[in-house]
């Protein structure tokens, strides 16, 4: 059974339209978040962890996109932070980076970005 995915129309003209799914937006958010120094990785739920161990790693693990209204989304991230980094500062950088990536690449307006810190990663573990 195929997953029920939300899609967004990002361009429509006489030649046709361009639609993207919420999965694409989640991947963009996840990649942007992991580019921030101090973010060790994304943290997924149990289902994501099982999928990852089965060899079907998803780039959107730990990311949820919520449609607020047409072309407006909220982002929920679950991340692991590296030990020794200032968590509020890292989270502010993640919020800025994710918002800019989604708005510039896709054209959707990001209304909020909520971050849950799942764990602190210690070097060597």
Language-model regions, residue ranges each:
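A generic structural motif
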Residues: 81-87
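Short, non-transmembrane amphipathic alpha-helical segments
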Residues: 87-106, 110
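Contiguous, often N-terminal, cationic amphipathic patches that form binding interfaces
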Residues: 2-81, 110-114, 118, 123-125
């Amino acid at each position: 059974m195929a997953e029920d995915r939300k899609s967004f129309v990002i361009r429509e003209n006489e030649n046709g339209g361009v639609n993207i799914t919420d999965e694409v937006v989640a991947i963009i958010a996840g990649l942007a978040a992991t580019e921030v120094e101090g973010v060790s990785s994304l943290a997924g739920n149990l289902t994501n962890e099982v999928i990852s161990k089965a060899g079907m790693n998803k780039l959107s693990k730990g990311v949820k996109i919520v449609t607020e209204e047409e072309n407006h989304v909220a982002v929920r991230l679950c991340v692991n932070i590296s030990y020794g980094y200032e968590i509020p500062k890292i989270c502010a950088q993640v919020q800025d980076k994710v918002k800019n990536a989604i708005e510039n690449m896709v054209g959707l307006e990001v209304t909020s970005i909520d971050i849950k810190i799942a764990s602190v990663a210690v070097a060597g573990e």
